[in-house]
A protein has these predicted regions:
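A short helix->loop->beta-strand "cap" motif at the edges of active sites that frequently abuts
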Residues: 52, 122, 201-204
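Short glycine-rich anion-binding loops that position phosphate/pyrophosphate groups of nucleotides
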Residues: 60-63, 185-190, 212-213
Length: 287
């Protein structure tokens, strides 16, 4: 095994986040009341300022996962940014007075951050997708943004990484030192991955963008604009992947509507968790 030195980030106690955009309360989950340019601004500022953190792109699926899992709810509360990925989260936010709130769709966020990164010189690493997808995405992004710096890709297995795979990933990231690791897994896998590996990988930010890898490489067709604006993109996804998604949408959508009614009519109080983040210290370790 190579004796190359790796850098591991060890989490300290969670501390209150510095000033950040206001949050809408979606069933107790704090979703930042922002639009696409503001989300890209936060990400850009974090990189320039040397902050370490992860970004969650969260819609109804993520909000409902947080109802079932305290661990997942905590992961969202510790995110640098939780963007409103679905129109229902935007509608609820606007009802709460966040009239400027707009949808921040994962694939759109990826393109906007990549576009801005060229002038800033920020670098990227692609983690996720089925075999060949990350490399395909690298080619797609390079064709669209010829000056973009994509310093590595990694296709994970559909399970937890083995110790050998962990070491291999850490070595690759340590050698390339990307500013951003884009994580293209499904919810909640990508959020769990970012939380578990944020302090173990030598990068600044991790951004979970779900289906963006498949959408940008044409594996999944994107929904028409009118379906996105009307909150019906889930129907478009369901049409393409009925056997995989029908249970998710049936359980999550129905459950969300029921719980949201309780919140909106003040029949149940969903307390908003304090936004936290981990302070970090650097520790050199040899593997």
């Amino acid at each position: 095994m190579s004796s190359a030195k790796l850098v591991e980030y060890l989490p300290a106690e969670p501390v209150a986040q510095p000033s950040s955009p206001p949050r809408a309360n979606i069933l107790g989950v704090g979703v930042h009341a922002i639009d696409l340019p503001q989300a890209a601004d936060v990400i850009e500022s974090a990189i320039v300022g040397g902050r370490k953190g992860y970004v969650c792109v969260t819609g109804v699926h993520g909000v409902m996962e947080a109802q079932r899992s305290e661990e997942f709810r905590t992961i969202l509360s510790r995110a640098l940014l939780v963007t409103p990925d679905g129109m229902p989260t935007v509608w609820v936010g606007r009802l709460q007075g966040h009239t400027h709130m707009r949808r921040v769709f994962g694939p759109d966020l990826m393109l906007e951050v990549c576009r801005r990164s060229i002038a800033a010189g920020h670098t990227h690493f692609l983690y996720g997708g089925k075999p060949g997808v990350a490399e395909h995405l690298r080619a797609v992004l390079t064709e669209r943004f010829p000056a973009i710096e994509i310093v590595g890709t990694y296709t994970p297995p559909f399970r937890d990484l083995s110790r050998a795979e962990e070491v291999n990933l850490m070595r690759q990231v340590s050698l390339s030192e990307p500013d951003i690791i884009w994580v293209g897994l499904s919810t909640p896998r990508q959020e769990l991955f970012m939380s578990n590996y944020l302090h173990r990988l030598k990068s600044k930010l991790m951004i979970g963008v779900g289906a963006a890898f498949d959408i940008h490489t044409g594996k999944i067709k994107d929904a028409p604009s009118w379906m996105k604006k009307s909150g019906l993109q889930w129907l478009h996804r369901l049409y393409q992947e009925p056997s995989r998604l029908w249970k998710r949408y049936l359980i999550n959508n129905c459950g969300f509507v029921g719980k949201l009614a309780l919140q909106l009519f003040r029949l149940k109080n969903y307390e908003l968790e304090q936004a936290l983040e981990y302070a970090t210290e650097l520790l050199d370790v040899n593997r």
